[in-house]
Amino acid sequence: MIKKDPIELFDLWYNEVLAVSLQDKKDPTAMVLATCSKDLKPSARVVLLKKYSDQGFVFFTNMNSRKGKEMAENPSVALVFDWSRISKQVRIEGRIKMLPCNDADEYYASRPRGSQIGAWCSKQSSVLENREDFVELIKEMTIKFHEKPIPRPDYWVGIVVVPMLMEFWQEGLNRIHTRYQYTRDSNNMDKWNVVSLYP
């Protein structure tokens, strides 16, 4: 039966793969994030889903990285969840918006201190000329922030992917897969139109 709300279906599948992941230790929050620069060069990488709701899918990143710069140039992105161990996949197309600063601050403060310091020291996606210098900088910053709260760098932000299209794929016998595609109504963001696609 096709559900009217794709977030409800996502939640159902996510909890299914989460139960399996408790046994096989594979991270169900891993998702491929595809971005595209203003000169139409695509790139993709794996990031981690931190939360989701009717408002969208949240992850955190360094906006000075390649993906950050590309999202600043072109806010249209795509996500893919490959949940092969339950024979399912979810594909999402949407646009990004920034998570409020206080939400980013709250999540940043919950991270291990080593990860917080790493966010200050890593010039993500830039050429690393000397790894020893990088390690030394981490040591210096560790001393600087010893027994002090570590503030969130301005460039380290939360991103919400607001879905405009969601496709759910389920493996079938003899490659007769099941595919449901949900698209948001352009006149009513609370309304989704759903169709079944050929495999």
UniProtKB/Swiss-Prot annotation:
Gene3D superfamilies: Electron Transport, Fmn-binding Protein, Chain A. It is an enzyme of class 1 (oxidoreductase). HAMAP family: PdxH (MF_01629). Substrate binds at residues 50, 107, 111, 115, 175-177. It catalyses: pyridoxamine 5'-phosphate + O2 + H2O = pyridoxal 5'-phosphate + H2O2 + NH4(+); pyridoxine 5'-phosphate + O2 = pyridoxal 5'-phosphate + H2O2. InterPro entries: Pyridox_Oxase, Pyridox_Oxase_CS, Pyridox_Oxase_N, Pyridoxamine_oxidase_dimer_C, Split_barrel_FMN-bd. Its cofactor is FMN. It holds the Pfam family PNP_phzG_C. Catalyzes the oxidation of either pyridoxine 5'-phosphate (PNP) or pyridoxamine 5'-phosphate (PMP) into pyridoxal 5'-phosphate (PLP). Homodimer. One of its GO terms (biological process) is pyridoxine biosynthetic process. Belongs to the pyridoxamine 5'-phosphate oxidase family. Its EC number is 1.4.3.5. Keywords: Flavoprotein, FMN, Oxidoreductase, Pyridoxine biosynthesis. Pathway: Cofactor metabolism; pyridoxal 5'-phosphate salvage; pyridoxal 5'-phosphate from pyridoxamine 5'-phosphate: step 1/1; Cofactor metabolism; pyridoxal 5'-phosphate salvage; pyridoxal 5'-phosphate from pyridoxine 5'-phosphate: step 1/1. FMN binds at residues 45-50, 60-61, 66-67, 89, 124-125, 169, 179. The gene is pdxH. One of its GO terms (molecular function) is FMN binding. This is Pyridoxine/pyridoxamine 5'-phosphate oxidase. Binds 1 FMN per subunit.
